[in-house]
């Protein structure tokens, strides 16, 4: 009788977005990676060590096939065409579509399972959960909570996605556009009328323009925005999109830490409001 085949875990993985690359490095499974996105910034060494095969919505399909991956990891509807092309070529593809903190943690669990290392994934998840809990505990001590407006894009104006909204709340802020944060697609988070932001009266403005350099003058010169407390008091900040707009370890560590620092400093300066 023939023996049943044993599982063969992927050894030649291509990551089309940054978060799976970073997760594999943190799990010390980076030896499996043979290709990455050209937009990968974390960890920095990945840019030196791995072949770049894609942008965000485009990929070098011939190069990917040449590398002979046994698994390609993709993300979201934005990479649907890339995924379709690879599947037609017989490539094994797993496409994640996580948009919240809990889904991001589950992504790590799933990823670790795909490579036969579930305990490493659980360890990383536990560390990330512990970090978030610590930040949340500190935020609970803040004397006052600011209203935070997070801008993901400037023209049209697009507000923060789900996990960003959750991180703002964990860090001690109140997301001005919680109702938009539930929308996974950017087109459904467009603020059609910029005066709506004025009506929200945010205390803090945070920009993360998805890879574009932040232009403070462009923001403060918007019609009527001088009436916004955040603009009036120069509580205007930028968080690098690499640190917050990738739904992976970066957002749950460095990203939320930057939010917490901005919010806690504001709360300290404005603690008289709570008296």
Where are these regions (language model features)?
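N-terminal ligand-binding lobe of clamshell/alpha-beta domains
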Residues: 1-275
């Amino acid at each position: 009788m023939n023996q049943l085949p044993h599982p063969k875990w992927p050894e030649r993985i291509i990551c089309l977005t940054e978060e799976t690359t970073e997760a594999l490095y943190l799990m010390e499974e980076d030896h499996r990676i043979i290709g990455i996105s050209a937009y990968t910034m974390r960890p920095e060494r990945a840019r030196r060590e791995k072949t770049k095969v894609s942008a965000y919505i485009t990929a070098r399909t011939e190069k990917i096939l040449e590398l002979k991956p046994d698994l390609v990891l993709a993300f979201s509807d934005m990479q649907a065409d890339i995924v379709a092309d690879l599947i037609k070529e017989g490539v094994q593809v797993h496409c994640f579509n996580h948009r919240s903190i809990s889904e991001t943690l589950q992504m790590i669990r799933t990823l670790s399972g795909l490579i036969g290392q579930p305990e490493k994934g659980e360890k990383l998840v536990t560390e990330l959960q512990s970090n978030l809990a610590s930040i949340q505990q500190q935020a609970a001590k803040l004397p006052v909570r600011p209203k935070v407006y997070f801008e993901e894009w400037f023209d049209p104006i697009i507000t923060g996605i789900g996990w960003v909204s959750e991180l703002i709340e964990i860090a001690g802020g109140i997301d001005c556009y919680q109702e938009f944060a539930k929308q996974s697609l950017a087109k459904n988070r467009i603020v059609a009328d910029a005066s709506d932001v004025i009506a929200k009266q945010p205390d803090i403005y945070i920009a993360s323009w998805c890879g574009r350099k932040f232009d403070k003058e462009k923001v403060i010169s918007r019609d009527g925005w001088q009436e916004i407390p955040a603009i009036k008091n120069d509580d205007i900040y930028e968080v690098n999109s690499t640190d917050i707009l990738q739904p992976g370890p970066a957002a749950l560590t460095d990203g939320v830490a930057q939010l917490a620092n901005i919010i806690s400093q504001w709360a300290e300066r404005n603690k008289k409001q709570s008296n």
